[in-house]
């Protein structure tokens, strides 16, 4: 059995780490490099770096920040933000990223997933999915350009359909960003994760809702996700990564202890 992964996330806008609630009303958290180093030192299994407005702004993630973070960490490093071509991806990887993640650009051009997977290998290609539960229809829909609330839009894709589509096209991993739970810290959407797990045959990462150590345990134990991503509980030092991993190990979760 592969060890479960704990993954802190740096949402970056205008050169600073920010955090919102349900992808809105972002507050400034702090400087990028010190936070990245802190999480690596605490025992994170991987670090995710999202330039949250790159896609909606029509630009690519700032490569200088990628290189600065890569210099201070020694854990796998996944980068997202406006990657629209093989050339974009190659540059990000050359600046120190280990994996690239695409989200809105994949929705705009699904063939991008296959082209990137063919060029760099499926193990290098992560697809992020921003999913919103519509209480009126009882359905989960994929949203696009969520880093800028003024430009966010609902796509024609239902979440389960898109999960299956991106796998067919070569996604090596999926990060499910559950927008309703984002920043609320009331727990992951276990029901949605179970539904996605049933149709997801590549590594699946839960994102959105962690508020306690028990929430991580529930995600691993009840939905069999491969990793759990979180931001605010780590940024605000509500949970220490090392202590979280010790707790999970004590509960019988296969986890890497530094």
UniProtKB/Swiss-Prot annotation:
Which reaction(s) does its UniProt entry say it catalyses? 5-[(5-phospho-1-deoxy-D-ribulos-1-ylimino)methylamino]-1-(5-phospho-beta-D-ribosyl)imidazole-4-carboxamide + L-glutamine = D-erythro-1-(imidazol-4-yl)glycerol 3-phosphate + 5-amino-1-(5-phospho-beta-D-ribosyl)imidazole-4-carboxamide + L-glutamate + H(+)
Q: Which GO terms describe its cellular component?
A: cytoplasm
Q: Which UniProt keywords apply?
A: Amino-acid biosynthesis, Cytoplasm, Histidine biosynthesis, Lyase
InterPro entries according to UniProt: Aldolase_TIM (IPR013785), His_biosynth (IPR006062), HisF (IPR004651), IGPS_HisA/HisF (IPR050064), RibuloseP-bd_barrel (IPR011060)
Q: Where is the active site?
A: 11, 130
What EC number(s) does this enzyme carry? 4.3.2.10
Q: Name one GO molecular function term.
A: imidazoleglycerol-phosphate synthase activity
* Subcellular location, record wording: Cytoplasm
Source organism superkingdom: Bacteria
Q: In which pathway does it act?
A: Amino-acid biosynthesis; L-histidine biosynthesis; L-histidine from 5-phospho-alpha-D-ribose 1-diphosphate: step 5/9
Q: Which SUPFAM superfamilies match?
A: Ribulose-phoshate binding barrel
Q: Which GO terms describe its biological process?
A: L-histidine biosynthetic process
Give the family per the record: Belongs to the HisA/HisF family.
Q: How does it assemble?
A: Heterodimer of HisH and HisF.
Say what the protein does.
IGPS catalyzes the conversion of PRFAR and glutamine to IGP, AICAR and glutamate. The HisF subunit catalyzes the cyclization activity that produces IGP and AICAR from PRFAR using the ammonia provided by the HisH subunit.
Q: Which HAMAP family does the entry mention?
A: HisF
What protein name is recorded for this chain? Imidazole glycerol phosphate synthase subunit HisF
Q: Please give the organism.
A: Citrobacter koseri (strain ATCC BAA-895 / CDC 4225-83 / SGSC4696)
């Amino acid at each position: 059995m592969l060890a479960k992964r704990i993954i802190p996330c740096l949402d970056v806008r205008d050169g600073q780490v920010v955090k919102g609630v349900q992808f809105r009303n972002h507050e400034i958290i702090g400087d990028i490099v010190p936070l990245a180093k802190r999480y690596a030192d605490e025992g994170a299994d991987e670090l995710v770096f999202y330039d949250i407005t790159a896609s909606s702004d029509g630009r690519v993630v700032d490569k200088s920040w990628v290189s600065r973070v890569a210099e201070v960490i020694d854990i796998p490093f996944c980068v997202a933000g406006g990657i629209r071509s093989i050339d974009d991806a190659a540059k990000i990887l050359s600046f120190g990223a280990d994996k690239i993640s695409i989200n809105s650009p994949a929705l705009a051009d699904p063939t991008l997933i296959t082209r990137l997977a063919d060029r760099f290998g499926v193990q290098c290609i992560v697809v992020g999915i921003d999913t919103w539960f519509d209480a009126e229809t009882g359905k989960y829909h994929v949203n696009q350009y969520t880093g800028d609330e003024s430009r966010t839009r609902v796509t024609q894709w239902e979440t389960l359909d898109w999960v299956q589509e991106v796998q067919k096209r070569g996604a090596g991993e999926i990060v499910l960003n559950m927008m309703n739970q984002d920043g609320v810290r009331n727990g992951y959407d276990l029901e949605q994760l179970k539904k996605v797990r049933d149709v997801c045959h590549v590594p699946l990462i839960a994102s959105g809702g962690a508020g306690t150590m028990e929430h991580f345990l529930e995600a691993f134990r009840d939905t069999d996700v491969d990793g759990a991503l979180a931001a605010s509980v780590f940024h605000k030092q509500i949970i220490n990564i090392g202590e979280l991993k010790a707790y999970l190990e004590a509960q019988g979760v296969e986890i890497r202890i530094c």
